[in-house]
Amino acid sequence: MLSKQIPLGIYEKALPAGECWLERLRLAKTLGFDFVEMSVDETDARLARLDWSREQRLALVSAVAETGVRVPSMCLSAHRRFPLGSEDDAVRAQGLEIMRKAIQFAQDVGIRVIQLAGYDVYYQQANDETRCRFRDGLKESVDMASRAQVTLAMEIMDYPLMNSISKALGYAHYLNNPWFQLYPDIGNLSAWDNDVQMELQAGIGHIVAVHVKDTKPGVFKNVPFGEGVVDFERCFETLKQSGYCGPYLIEMWSETAENPAAEVAKARDWVKARMASAGLVEAA
């Protein structure tokens, strides 16, 4: 029987670096998490995962089966380097090929949701043409995802093009496809001039997962929990009252810390205490 508790996961980059997924999932289980989100970023090392052999893919599936800790989602931030909105046709083609490989990888290993980075371009200057190319690239990507039955979910970003649920919903309506949904980050959402609770309510019915982190205006990474502007309890209450029952993912970048597991455990306890106050989980 499926558990009725709220699934709580941890981002791969919060845990010690390395390519042994059995070790990573065992550690996540020890720390009390239900799942781990894989990162495929713009580095060559993580991009190489999309070219894993059949045996390497099966090893990940086996690690999930052995530990009971799932890998249901992928954070695909590689499109910073190879953006779908690039005016360089070769770069854009690489971006689409990365998308194709990511969808195939997800299909092979059981990943259900690929979180997309909402950048038309990242290292270049955006303009009307980059946005048009980005829209067309999303359409092509969602067509691929539909055939594979893999959900593409747009993150709410540290970038003006996609810094609110309202803006992401515009793309959802434009694409009008059940395999394109939203994956908001309550930290990014709170760092901009948004009515955060109204935005969360507006996204209900399209939100497939939620990133949990703290932020400050203009500071989107590595803000310790409790030191930023995010009203976690209100966000959790709003999501619960709106009927959201999906997963929450603690997003951290502690893989190079002296003791990543201790950092993660501290963050886990802090977040779960706010979840308990909001009635999402039972108090410890």
From Swiss-Prot:
It catalyses: L-ribulose 5-phosphate = L-xylulose 5-phosphate. It comes from the Bacteria. GO terms for biological process: L-ascorbic acid catabolic process. GO terms for molecular function: intramolecular oxidoreductase activity, interconverting aldoses and ketoses; L-ribulose-5-phosphate 3-epimerase activity. Keywords: Isomerase. Its EC number is 5.1.3.22. The keyword Isomerase applies. Induction: Induced by L-ascorbate. Repressed by UlaR. The keyword Isomerase applies. Pathway: Cofactor degradation; L-ascorbate degradation; D-xylulose 5-phosphate from L-ascorbate: step 3/4. InterPro entries: L-Ru-5P_3-Epase, L-Ru-5P_3-Epase_Enterobacteria, Sugar_Epim/Isomerase, Xyl_isomerase-like_sf, Xyl_isomerase-like_TIM-brl. Belongs to the L-ribulose-5-phosphate 3-epimerase family. HAMAP family: UlaE. NCBIfam families: hxl6Piso_put, PRK13209.1, PRK13210.1. Catalyzes the isomerization of L-xylulose-5-phosphate to L-ribulose-5-phosphate. Is involved in the anaerobic L-ascorbate utilization. This is L-ribulose-5-phosphate 3-epimerase UlaE. It comes from Salmonella paratyphi B (strain ATCC BAA-1250 / SPB7). The lineage of its organism: Bacteria, Pseudomonadati, Pseudomonadota, Gammaproteobacteria, Enterobacterales. The gene is ulaE.
